[in-house]
Amino acid sequence: MIVLGLRVWTLSQAWYDYDRWFTEFRAASAVVPPGARLLVVEAPIPEQKHLPGVPASLAMVQWRTFVHMAALVVIDRAAFFPYMFTGWTTIDVTPRNEAVSQREAVPMTPEELTKSADPEQAKSLSIGPDVVGELPYWRNWPQTFDFVLWIDFGDAAKPELRELQPVARGSFFEIYRVVRSST
């Protein structure tokens, strides 16, 4: 009975913390206008990152929890993010966003974002079709996306890319506007 009580308490505390983080993100995402395309970058969560208020042995922050956090921008702001189960569910992509949508994907890594911003470094990335024949949604991101959500819990070094202009920040994320080059 004690183990069950401890598990219920841990789960409740974890939900409380995730709810606080997601509420923080929802408030900051108000900078994203309706119809905008949102690219998500997620740095690996440090192994020592734990849920606040929960013993470390019971509550590690799980990266999977944040993979689809951008779906809140779809709900709240009528924005687009590229891997929202399209094709496998009744969710359809508008013709405008078909070229930057994937049925199954995960956020970009910081390395992919940095390399793909530079045409020379982008050549070293694998940007061929996936198992269902879709190209990576993030290719040519500076030309196709309007905003970048960078999730890193404040622990990852961020590259200085001229394409990114910070517009909002939270305790574990930053939102950037994509600045398109004039060339």
Regions found by a protein language model. Name each.
Residues L149-T183:
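Solvent-exposed soluble domains appended to multi-pass membrane proteins
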Residues M1-D17, V40:
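Transmembrane alpha-helical segments
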Residues Y18-W21, A28-S124, V131, W141-F153:
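Short periplasmic/luminal acceptor-recognition loop of GT-C membrane glycosyltransferases, typified by
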Residues E24-A28, P159-R162:
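A short acidic, amphipathic alpha-helical/loop segment
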Residues R7-L11, D130, K158:
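Generic, low-specificity signal for short hydrophobic/alpha-helical stretches with a mild N-terminal bias
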Residues M1-L4, A70, Q165-A168:
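Generic secretory/membrane-interface signal
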